[in-house]
């Protein structure tokens, strides 16, 4: 079931909250950023729990950073040096994180007002990114569809370009399976089905190499409690995880997250080859939904994607979308208790 609820006004335009429910779970979506605002699932006692960080007003989404729940594009993650070359032509895109381009630039897709259509169990958002937006070549039409059925949220991405360009889409939901207002996620247990990761330089930009997780704190192939990893000063400067994993591939389980306190778990599968694991180490203090105060280490992002900086790394799978081709990607989150 899909219903619209008044949420706010932006630039004179009414912004509704779009709610999908399958009778067991419910997701709240916003046309601003094609974003997930809330996701309510039952805990082991049957109590409905909102497990995504979000805001109570449109203005917070417009003015604050961190991309809470937003659709990220035109190119998710980092492009080293904020430039790339396609067929001999070099393009300079917006540098909004030092010398690099992060999450599509200053006004990425998470800062755009999308059109939408509703169906019984799905919402499709559409946005047309003009040629030259944030420096990226070619006009690109993007569709993002959210489907909710049988306790599973599916996100489907489609894109078509009028000119060869870079497209790398993801969702930046911050999951806290203890409840969005429950504090740090140290009690969560995480598994990531990946034998390798992409090492980075000092700017967190992949160098083009792959490395084994064996013998490192990045090895999450068996269920691992996050508590010891979030504030270890010897690990990523005490900021926790902000690393891209090379998923083992296939339409099998890519990652699983579980909160023993509530019993809520999610199992994630995806068509993508990479996943940025981010445990919100750089999330600055801010007021979220219902007056909750969010801060570092209070969410887990499972950002399925092409590898960061792939357009500048020939050994990585290419994020280039050719004119006349259609990009199709998907990610599913299945919610259950144990």
Report residues per predicted region.
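An exposed, glycine/acidic-rich loop-and-rim segment of catalytic or binding clefts
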Residues: 1-338
């Amino acid at each position: 079931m899909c219903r619209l609820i008044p949420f706010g006004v932006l630039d004179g335009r009414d912004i509704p909250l779009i709610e999908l429910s399958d009778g067991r779970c419910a997701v709240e979506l916003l046309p601003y950023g094609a974003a997930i605002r809330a996701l309510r699932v039952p805990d082991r006692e049957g109590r409905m729990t909102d497990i995504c960080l979000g805001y109570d007003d449109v203005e917070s989404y417009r003015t604050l950073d961190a991309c809470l729940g937003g659709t990220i594009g035109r190119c998710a993650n980092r492009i080293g040096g904020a430039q790339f070359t396609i067929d001999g032509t070099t393009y300079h895109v917006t540098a909004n994180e030092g010398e690099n381009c992060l999450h599509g630039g200053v006004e990425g897709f998470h800062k755009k007002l999308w059109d939408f259509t509703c169906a019984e169990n799905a919402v499709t958002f559409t946005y047309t990114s003009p040629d030259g937006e944030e420096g990226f070549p070619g006009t690109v039409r993007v569709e993002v569809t959210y489907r909710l059925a049988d306790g599973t949220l599916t996100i489907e991405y489609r894109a078509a370009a009028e000119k060869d360009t870079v497209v790398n889409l993801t969702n930046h939901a911050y999951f806290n399976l203890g409840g969005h207002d429950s504090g740090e996620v140290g009690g969560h247990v995480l598994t990531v089905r990946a034998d390798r990761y992409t090492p980075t330089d000092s700017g967190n930009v992949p160098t083009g190499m792959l490395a084994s997780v064996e013998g490192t704190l990045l090895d999450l192939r068996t269920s691992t409690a996050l508590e010891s990893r979030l504030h270890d000063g010897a690990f990523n400067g005490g900021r926790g995880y902000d690393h891209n994993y090379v998923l083992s591939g296939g339409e099998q389980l890519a990652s699983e997250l579980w909160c023993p306190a509530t019993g809520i778990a999610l199992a994630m599968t995806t068509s993508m080859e990479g996943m940025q694991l981010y445990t919100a180490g750089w999330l600055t203090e801010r007021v979220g939904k219902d007056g909750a105060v969010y801060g570092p280490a209070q969410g887990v992002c499972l950002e399925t994607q092409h590898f960061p900086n792939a357009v500048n790394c020939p050994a990585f799978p290419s994020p280039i979308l050719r004119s006349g081709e259609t990009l199709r990607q998907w990610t599913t989150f299945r919610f259950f208790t144990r």
